[in-house]
UniProtKB/Swiss-Prot annotation:
It comes from Namaquaphasma ookiepense. Mediates visceral muscle contractile activity (myotropic activity). This is CAPA-Periviscerokinin-1. Keywords: Amidation, Neuropeptide, Secreted. Its main location: secreted. The modification Valine amide is found at residue 11. GO terms for biological process: neuropeptide signaling pathway.
């Protein structure tokens, strides 16, 4: 999921 700098999709 979101790490702050790079938004990752929550899968």
């Amino acid at each position: 999921e979101s790490a702050g700098l790079i938004p990752f999709p929550r899968v």
